[in-house]
Amino acid sequence: MSFELSNIEYNDEKSWNLICEGKTKGVFQLESNLGRAWAKKVKPKNIEELSDLVAIIRPGCLKAIVDGKSMTQHYVDRKHGVSEVLYLHDSLEPILKKTQGVLVYQEQSMKIAQVLAGFDLQEADDLRKAIGKKKADLMAVIKKRFIKGAKKQGIVSKAVAEEIFGWIEKSSRYAFNKSHSISYAICAYWSAYCKAHHPVEFYCKYIQFSGGKPDPQQEVRELVTDAKSNDIYINPPSLKKLNLTTEIIDNSIHFGLLEVKQIGDKQINRLKERLPESEESIGKPISEWSWYEFLIGFSSKVYATLITALVSVGALSGKGVSRSKMLYEFDTWQKLTDKEREWSLGVYKDHDNLLDLLKTIQPTKKQGGGTHNAKIENPCYSLDDDPEWVIREEENYLGVPITYSRVESCDTSLANTTCKDVINGRDGNVKMAVTINAVRKIQTKKGDDMAFLSVEDNTGALDNITIFKDQWQEYKNILYQNNNVLIIGKKENKKKDGIIVDKVLEI
């Protein structure tokens, strides 16, 4: 896949829809829960509005409370006609109209000072520096200059000038540099475009670079879940592919062998050294080996920790044998004596499974042997792959479950809706079997506790699960991270992917 970013059109509907729907995991500046939530509220449709979004979701703007709500919320309400845009003076409208009357950028303060107080570019830049660096002493000096200049210009009264400058002073807590914000917005749009039009490449690259995140494991988990909601499934490492890092192979994303815990360069180097000889001996490439051929013809030539890790993450899947059975037979094979294993290498091609091979090298129980035969014929536990065990092993070795989602280890028969169904617009009552990723408890204005949940299943994730006070009091003991629950509720009309909870059952 190759294209020039400079050739991207900035009116691409698919890209803007992705942003407006909050599907911005991995999108520059907007990938957090906060960014996704406000992207859905702001619904930007051009670079200017996207720049505004980048600026108003910064902590200062979110914490700047005027008339009971943040400046961020004021922007959203005014943009969508919920509240009226009012200006302290008519002269401010040309400067603030594009940002819904909210003083979003430092450059707007500079322009106000130029228009109302006659500041030249240097004086306006001094104001910008005072705002950006929050220099109270410099701001006090500039305020005197501003009031004096405003009087000379005669556009506003002294009282209005003081009120406007007071507003500028308050904006120093949140006003952002517009040139920075525009450049961030362009990068955000580029990444949204890539995600909208080249999703496989997008997810592959972001997984590759997840190591630079504060919590790489959590980053990969979120990317894998987000990819599922777009019908893109990340595959476990595979000995058929032999890729070392995450790569796109046959238009599918595959984790690399080196991304498995307990597998390092030393183990991989030995695998590569011993592989050609074994492929020649077995008579076919590793991609065509059966599990039996791999076990007898190759497993003794590499580290046991490598085999255990590869089997546990599914790197040998597709050979018609469960992972549990592979590990069980590998353990049995390791317990044979060196002489027994050496003899087996000479005759194993006469058989097609470990049990038949063992019968040729060990006598029956009546003959004083058969211990390993009995172990293979009558295992002490089921060798089927239990989803809960697979999830646990993949989380242990990869940091994220790939084959199953965590909730698939539970009884989900009562569920009638998936996360993806909700994302795609399903209405009405819902029953969802999900894993809780996060719980955010808040207090209402009346002092009551309520909460918002982030959840996921095998189809994707949702961040807008609302638990009001009564439900919180009743179910809070089972509402915790990583718990699997059945959520019974209804679609929230105001939010495309919001759910209001009526009941919660632990599953």
What function would you assign to each model-found segment?
Residues 1-507:
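Noncatalytic, beta-rich nucleic-acid-contacting surfaces in large DNA/RNA-processing enzymes
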